Amino acid sequence: MSLDPIILLTLRASVTLLFASAIAHKLWNAAEFQQTLRGYLQGFSANEHGLQKPLFLMIVVLEFIVLGLCLFPSTHIAAGLLASGVLLVYAAVMAVNLLRRNVLIDCGCSWGKSRHMLHPALLVRNVMLALAALAITLPLNDRELFTLDVISLVFATVTAAVLYTAGNKILSLGFTERMKIA
């Protein structure tokens, strides 16, 4: 099975943007993200003292590797597999914290402007993102790209980014209110 180049290239560009923005978020808000990591570690009953900085560095390096793989067409299979795996690990970590009722921590995805309480909807979101990332491993339908294709690619990628941002904002609105109550 192969995908039309516009669909596949839009997915690749969107996954690239997702990981680039995730890296920027973590680097610009390093202290807040380390606080979030501390909350997640508590859900694992781990002694978080001293773990959050190495874990922070490991996550950033891993996301940089995904980003680097996403930038080159020849590494799209590795990019898709690793990106999907990272997103599923994040979902699994959220699931463990949800099961242990450690939900009053930020999910780590809000750019420091609003805090998302952990919720099963975030697991669904991450699984959907992982499936999209996995789709970039599919072979590209080898057809010539035209100017209209490139324009479509740009608009589709921007639309995907706007929809992702809007979806996160909608999720945060409901969860933020519950965090204030708790």
Identify the role of each PLM range.
Residues M1-A182:
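Membrane-interfacial helix-loop segments of redox and metal-homeostasis proteins
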